[in-house]
């Protein structure tokens, strides 16, 4: 169902089933001041002009308001099963900006900020002057990894224009035309599942069984510990090493993603207890649906939308690294099918039902190294913006999610010719030293298996 103006300036639509499913997962941790799977995306940048913190903050706030006009869904709220957007008055716009754009002191680091983030009814932004970095934080039902980085790009572009005094006149009241529809609306999926959709959904649901008895990392610390903050261990390959990795992957007819995925499997087996290393490894096959959507929904104008999907996929411990990599390559190349797309609504409906029925949690809880990739991040965030003599250079980008479980997530992307490996973990279950060691092993495994080390 499309957006409808229910009162002057108030636009509403039903929450999509995929949004509802992801929101249900995130909301369960609100009682402890956290939000599982909330997304953080950021960029470190420099400007060719020196600005006082006060002036930069003023430019950022102006850019933030203009950014909302271009991507109004960042200011949507949800109550019950309804998503709402209110065209703001000047006072409401100022109040929203003050609530959602946070300027931190020089001593605040991105690592500490992310570990302390709390749920918000809106997408929020954080300026870290000490790192020359901006971070966007959003509930996962609002966007996905690709969309989050596209939003980073859009904000930096708007900021560069604001600094370069290239502002545009904003006609509040017509931004509703850019509100994001749900994936079910974009794919024109029926409310009532057909027999074909039910069968496709059944096949996707079957993959959940692969999580049972799967290998995971050996536990450390207190098994009964409550989750704490989300931290990360990061490793960046040099441009020369990245080029060598890409060439070696091409020679073996596998993608970088498939190679890193096979390395995540190898890392999980290495980090498992010795008596668990013969178990199969199960992880998520994640796909961006954006390339499969009709324009304009396939483009960055609809970055503030949840357009992703996936299913579980196992590989046995008996296979070699290259056998696993080739199996992942085949799966990534064939995973998005007509059946997969047409069951997106019903699959989410079934998962919501499973969660609401309160199925007992798996014992032991999953603890594998899972994987998520945004590929070439330069396709999402430009390394350089120029407006009226103002030059904004992006030094680096980053993407991750909040995790409140024993699972870790390897995020990978390339930017400015470098492969970035970003291991996200909860500090209640992993010591920083172990996480740093794990990401080093991951990179070493990748290079060794490709004949580069």
Swiss-Prot record:
Induction record: Expression is positively regulated by the azaterrilone A cluster-specific transcription factor tazR.
Q: In which pathway does it act?
A: Secondary metabolite biosynthesis
Which InterPro entries does the protein's record reference? CAT-like_dom_sf
Q: What is its EC number?
A: 2.3.2.-
Enzyme class, spelled out: transferase
A GO MF annotation of the entry reads:
transferase activity
Q: What keywords is this UniProt entry annotated with?
A: Transferase
Task: From the record, give the transmembrane residue ranges.
Answer: none
The text of the family note is:
Belongs to the trichothecene O-acetyltransferase family.
Role according to the record: Highly reducing polyketide synthase; part of the gene cluster that mediates the biosynthesis of azaterrilone A and other azaphilones, a class of fungal metabolites characterized by a highly oxygenated pyrano-quinone bicyclic core and exhibiting a broad range of bioactivities. The first step of the pathway begins with the non-reducing polyketide synthase tazA that assembles one acetyl-CoA starter unit, five malonyl-CoA units, and catalyzes a series of Claisen condensations, methylation, PT-mediated cyclization, and finally releases the first hexaketide precursor through the R-domain.
Any idea what this protein is called?
A: Probable acetyltransferase tazD
Which organism encodes this protein? Answer: Aspergillus terreus (strain NIH 2624 / FGSC A1156)
**Gene that encodes it:** tazD
């Amino acid at each position: 169902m499309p957006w409808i103006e229910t009162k002057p300036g108030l636009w509403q639509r039903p929450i999509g089933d995929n949004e509802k499913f992801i929101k249900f997962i995130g909301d369960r941790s609100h009682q402890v001041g956290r939000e599982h799977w909330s997304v953080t995306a950021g960029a470190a940048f420099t400007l060719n002009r020196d600005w006082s913190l006060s002036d930069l903050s003023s430019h950022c706030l102006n850019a933030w308001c203009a950014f909302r006009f271009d991507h109004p869904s960042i200011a949507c709220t949800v109550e019950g099963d309804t998503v709402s957007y209110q065209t703001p008055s000047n006072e409401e716009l100022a109040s929203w900006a003050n609530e959602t754009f946070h300027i931190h002191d020089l001593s605040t680091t991105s690592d500490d900020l992310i570990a302390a983030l709390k749920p918000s009814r809106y997408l929020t932004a954080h300026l870290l002057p000490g790192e020359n970095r901006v971070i966007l934080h959003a509930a996962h039902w609002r966007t996905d990894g690709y969309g989050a980085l596209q939003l980073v790009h859009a904000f930096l572009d708007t900021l560069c224009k604001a600094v370069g005094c290239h502002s545009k006149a904003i006609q509040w009241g017509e931004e509703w035309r850019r509100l994001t529809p749900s994936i079910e609306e974009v794919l024109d999926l029926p409310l009532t599942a057909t027999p074909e959709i039910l069968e496709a959904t059944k096949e996707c649901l079957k993959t959940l069984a692969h999580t049972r008895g799967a290998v995971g990392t050996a536990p450390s610390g207190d098994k009964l510990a409550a989750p704490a903050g989300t931290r990360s261990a990061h490793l960046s390959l040099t441009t020369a090493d990245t080029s060598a990795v890409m060439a070696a992957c091409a020679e073996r007819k596998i993608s970088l993603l498939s190679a890193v995925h096979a390395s995540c499997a190898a890392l999980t087996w290495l980090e498992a207890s010795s008596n668990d290393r013969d178990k199969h490894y199960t992880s998520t096959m994640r796909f961006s649906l954006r390339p499969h959507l009709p324009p304009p929904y396939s483009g960055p104008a609809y970055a503030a939308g949840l357009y992703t999907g996936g299913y579980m996929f196992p590989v046995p411990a008996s296979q070699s690294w290259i056998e696993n990599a080739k199996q992942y390559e085949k799966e990534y190349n064939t995973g998005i099918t007509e059946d997969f797309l047409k069951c997106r609504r019903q699959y989410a409906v079934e998962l919501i039902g499973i969660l609401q029925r309160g199925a007992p949690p798996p014992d032991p809880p999953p603890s594998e190294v899972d994987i998520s990739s945004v590929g070439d991040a330069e396709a999402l965030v430009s390394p350089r913006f120029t407006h009226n003599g103002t030059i904004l250079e992006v030094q680096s980008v980053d993407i991750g999610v909040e995790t409140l479980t024993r699972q870790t997530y390897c995020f990978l992307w390339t930017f400015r010719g470098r492969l970035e490996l970003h291991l996200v973990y909860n500090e209640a279950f992993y010591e920083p030293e172990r996480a740093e060691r794990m990401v080093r092993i991951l990179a070493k495994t990748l290079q060794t298996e490709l004949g580069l080390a």
